[in-house]
Amino acid sequence: MIAHSQDMSIVYHKINQLSSKAETILIYQSFIYGNRLTHPANLFIIKMNLIEINKIIILMKEGSFMEWTTEKRYLPYNKWDAETLLDLQAQADQSQSQLHYHIRPSSGLLNDPNGFSYFNGAWHVFYQQYPFGPVHGLKSWHHMKSADLVHWEDMGLAVKPDTQFDSHGAYSGSATVINDKLFLMYTGNVRDQDWVRHSYQNGAWMDQTGHIEKLARPLIEAPDHVTEHFRDPQILKHGDKYYAILGAQDKETKTGKIAIFSASDLTGKWTDLGYVNFTDKDMGYMIECPNLVFVDDQPVLIFCPQGLDKKITPYENIYPNMYVAGSKFKFDAGKMTTTQAAPINLDDGFDVYATQAFNAPDGKAYAISWVGLPDVEYPTDNENWANCLSQVKELSLKNGRLIQRPVAAMGTLRQAGHLIRTEKVIDGRQVVESHAGQQYELKITIARNQSGTLHLAGNHTVDQSLQLNFNTGKDAFFEIDRSKAGQTFNEKFGVTRKIRLPENQDLDLDIFIDHSLAEVFVNNGEHVMTLRYFADQKNDKIALTGKNSLNYYGTFWNLADM
C-alpha cells in the first residue's frame, strides 16, 4: 500500500471525479454490508478497479477521510458547505444500524438531552448535536417536538454557538415555562487564545413560534470556588424564587459537586448558595448533568459522577448515571434529607448517560437519556454519525427505589401482535420467533425455578446472538451478554452486565428492539438495562435454550416507525 497521505489523496480525488459523495456513501455500504445497491455498485466497478476499491474500504473503515483536528472540530458552521451536510444526512439515513422509533441525530453526533419540557400544548426536548461528524465538536441544541412523547417532529437546530458567550459550544442545560414563553438556560463554552475554558450560564427565550432570542449577558459566571468545570444548569422554580443546580468541580479539593444558585428575578442577580448537601461521600472528581425531580412528591437527584470510587457504588461503565432519593429538599439551605447510604445506578446496562428528568404540569415525572457515553467509540462512527436518545420513561418510587416504565403512548407503535407460549424443544432450542425483524416489543414472563438463555438477534443456530441469561431459582440473576451479538466494541469495560433478582420468582421482561438498540425493562421497571449492539441485520431469531424445556408466555408486537 502506498504512503497514507498520497493514497488518501489519490482515492479521494478519484471519488470526487467519478461519483457524487452521496453515491460514494451508498457504494461504501454496498461493499461493507453487502447491500444490493445495483446502480452505485455497478457505477463504482465500472469506474474504479478492485485495488482502488480495497483502498477506499480500508480508508473508510479507519475513518481516514476526515482528520479531526481541534481546528476542524471548532470550525464555524458557516465554513462548512451545504453539500457536506446533505451528504452526511444521507449517510446517516442509509445506515443499517439506524434507529426508527428513537430520536437520533439528523447527522453527526448526538449527546445529552436538553430542555426537556411541556410548553404550548406540546412536549419538547433538545439534544446536543455536532452536525458535521461523529465527534465532540462545536455543539448546538437540536429541537424535537411531540404530541405524545413517542412521535417526535424534527424542528431543526435551535440554540447555536453564535455569540461571544458560547463561541465554542452551546452546551447542556434545561428549560422552564414562564408565562407564554419557554426559558432556556444553558452553558456557553468559550475558549480563549490560550485554549483556557470559560463557562458561562446563559439564558434564552423561545416563543410559541419556536423563535429563540438569547439574553445579551450571562446569568451566572463561575464563582471563585470552582474550576473551569462548571456546567449543565437545571433551572427550577420553588415558591417565589428561581433556583439553578449545576455540575461542578471544587477548585480546592478537585472533587465533584452540585452547585446551587438562587434569584428572585430570573434575569437579574443570581446568588451563590454553595453546594448541595446530599451525601457525606466523595463523588469523584466531577459531577455532570445534575437533575432534581420530584417523584411521588419525594425529591430525587439524578446525576453523573465521574471518577466515583467503585467501593461506594459498584458500576462497570466508564462513567455511571446515578440517583439519590430523599424525603425533603431545602432549597435555600441546599440540603437533601435522605437515608440512602450511597447512590444507585439509574440504568444497569451498557450505554446510558446524562439523563434529564422533569415534572410535567400534572406532577408526573418523566426522564430521557443519552444512549451513549463520553470517551467511547461506536461502530457507526465509521458512518459519520453516533448515538441516540432513549425512549421516554415515566418515574415512580417503590421502597425508596426508582421505578422506570415506558410511557403509555409507546403502545401506539404496536402493529400486529400475537401471543407466545411454551414451544417444544427442537435441535436444542425453543423458537419464540423465527423472523422477528428489527423493530419489535417482546413482553415475556419466564417461570420461576428455571435457568437458561433468551437469545435475541440470533442466527439460525443462535450461536451468534444477544444473550439474556437468567436464573429464576436460588441465587437468582439476570445478565446481558453482547459478546456474540455482532461487531464488538468498548470491550475494555466488559461485555456483560448482571443484576440480582428475587429468588424463586417469575421473571417479567418488557424488551424493546430498534435495529441497534435494546431497552430491557426488568420486573415492571425495577431495573432498566439499555445497550447498543451491532448484529448482522439478517439475524433476527428469538429463541430460548437451557438444560431442560423452559416455561414461558407473553406477547410479541412489531413496532412502527415513530
Where are the regions that the model predicts?
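Short, Lys/Arg-enriched N-terminal segments with co-localized hydrophobic residues
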Residues: 43-65
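Short hydrophobic targeting helices and cationic amphipathic motifs
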Residues: 13, 17, 29, 40-43, ...
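N-terminal, intrinsically disordered charge-dense segments
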Residues: 19-21
